[in-house]
């Protein structure tokens, strides 16, 4: 794997912007989907694991005016990017950053909400740049360890939301079940009507619940589907 930094382009949303940076991860549809889909009503304290540029924290801060959000990342470039994006947002007073490994960091309280776009390449060629490798590969944050840590940090009635590709998501859910998690919500995402499901959005909790299942298709022909627009229109400029 070649070392180095990866410059990512900036991205402007309706109420905040993501500046160009060396964070290693550009704004992705996965992240926007998760930030728009995750439900944190009745939550007070949210933990954003692997915040990167701070996208998920900013989306949740926009959606939930009562949330106090702690964002963590192991990468220094990500911390710099998130700090810049937070400081220029309308919600900077509710956004806190911590630099370090979430498996080792000490927190003063538990969280009733967790959001995470986890790494998901378990094998194969590593990403070219160091930051992208950290963001994309499970070498630095294995899924079983992530789930165990989330159990420690989540309140008994809290909720943890994730997005993963189909295969990795199914494996993640199997691990979660083995650890005693319960699947509260599940959304199967397809890029277009004739394409197979390629992403899973899901909410896990430690309390028992009946699973609510739904489907989402991103594109309908040459345009975004009505369901995708409804989900994301508070964020994308051209919706």
Curated annotation (Swiss-Prot):
Q: Which InterPro entries match?
A: DNA_methylase_N6_adenine_CS, SAM-dependent_MTases_sf, Small_mtfrase_dom, tRNA_Adenine-N(6)_MTase, tRNA_adenine-N6_MeTrfase
Question: EC no.?
Answer: 2.1.1.223
- Offer one example of a GO biological process linked to this entry: methylation
Where it mainly occurs, coarsely classed, is cytoplasm
Subcellular location field: Cytoplasm
Q: Which GO terms describe its cellular component?
A: cytoplasm
Report the catalytic activity: adenosine(37) in tRNA1(Val) + S-adenosyl-L-methionine = N(6)-methyladenosine(37) in tRNA1(Val) + S-adenosyl-L-homocysteine + H(+)
Q: Which Pfam families match?
A: MTS
The answer to keyword Repeat applying to this record is no
Statement: the UniProt record of this protein carries the keyword Cytoplasm: yes
What keywords is this UniProt entry annotated with?
Answer: Cytoplasm, Methyltransferase, S-adenosyl-L-methionine, Transferase, tRNA processing
Which Gene Ontology molecular-function terms are recorded?
Answer: nucleic acid binding; tRNA (adenine-N6)-methyltransferase activity
Q: What does this protein do?
A: Specifically methylates the adenine in position 37 of tRNA(1)(Val) (anticodon cmo5UAC).
Family per similarity comment: Belongs to the methyltransferase superfamily. tRNA (adenine-N(6)-)-methyltransferase family.
Return the HAMAP family for the record.
tRNA_methyltr_YfiC
Q: PANTHER family of this UniProt entry?
A: TRNA1(VAL) (ADENINE(37)-N6)-METHYLTRANSFERASE
This protein is called what? tRNA1(Val) (adenine(37)-N6)-methyltransferase
Origin species, per record, is: Vibrio vulnificus (strain CMCP6)
């Amino acid at each position: 794997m070649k070392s180095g930094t990866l410059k990512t382009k900036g991205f402007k949303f309706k109420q905040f912007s993501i500046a160009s940076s060396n964070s290693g991860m550009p704004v992705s549809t996965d992240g926007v989907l998760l930030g728009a889909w995750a439900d944190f009503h009745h939550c007070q304290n949210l933990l954003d694991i692997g915040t990167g540029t701070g996208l998920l924290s900013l989306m949740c801060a926009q959606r939930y005016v009562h949330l106090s959000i702690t964002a963590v990342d192991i990468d220094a470039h990500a911390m710099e990017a998130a700090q810049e994006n937070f400081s220029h947002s309308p919600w900077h007073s509710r956004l806190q950053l911590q630099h370090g490994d979430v498996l080792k960091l000490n927190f003063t309280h538990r969280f009733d909400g967790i959001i995470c776009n986890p790494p998901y390449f378990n094998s194969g060629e590593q990403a070219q740049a160091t930051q992208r490798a950290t963001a994309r590969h499970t070498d630095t944050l294995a899924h079983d360890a992530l789930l165990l840590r989330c159990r420690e940090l989540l309140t008994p009635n809290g909720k943890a939301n994730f997005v993963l590709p189909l295969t990795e998501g199914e494996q993640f859910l199997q691990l979660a079940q083995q650890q005693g998690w319960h699947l509260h919500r599940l959304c199967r995402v397809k890029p277009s009507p004739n394409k197979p499901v390629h992403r899973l959005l899901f909410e896990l909790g430690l309390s028992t619940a009946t699973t609510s299942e739904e489907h989402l298709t991103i594109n309908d022909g040459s345009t975004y589907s009505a369901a995708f627009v409804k989900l994301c229109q508070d964020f994308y400029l051209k919706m």
